[in-house]
Amino acid sequence: MRRLIALFGAAFLLINVFSKAYAQGDEGALAIIVPGGGTYSRPITTDSEEAQAFFDQGIRMAWGFYFPESIASYQEAARLDPDSPMPHWGIAHAAGPNPNSRYQGLPDDPQGAGLAAIRRAMELADNG
């Protein structure tokens, strides 16, 4: 019975979070801000407070080894401010080699996403 209650509670929470994201009206969004995800901020050159928030969330997610979620947050920051190089740096950081993948014998940056992202960041580096 406790498992059933926990399952319904988790389902309700997920529905609540995603319905709020959908209600915000941005159907092209690649990620949402996860409440309670921390407060660390690393200022980047951007005029978009939302892009800054997603960049910060990307760092916090990467530090927690939530790499797919981190990449989604960085991609959303890049979508919101396409001229900022740092979201692309973040994608490279999260998509590139990490100790866990090497321990499992997985290849570094198997699809080349990290290399492509760092190249894009270098192209935009003069923007800030």
Residue ranges and their predicted role:
Residues 1-4:
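Positively charged n-region of N-terminal signal peptides that target proteins for export
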Residues 6-20:
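Bacterial N-terminal signal peptides
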Residues 25-128:
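Short coil/linker segments at helix-helix boundaries
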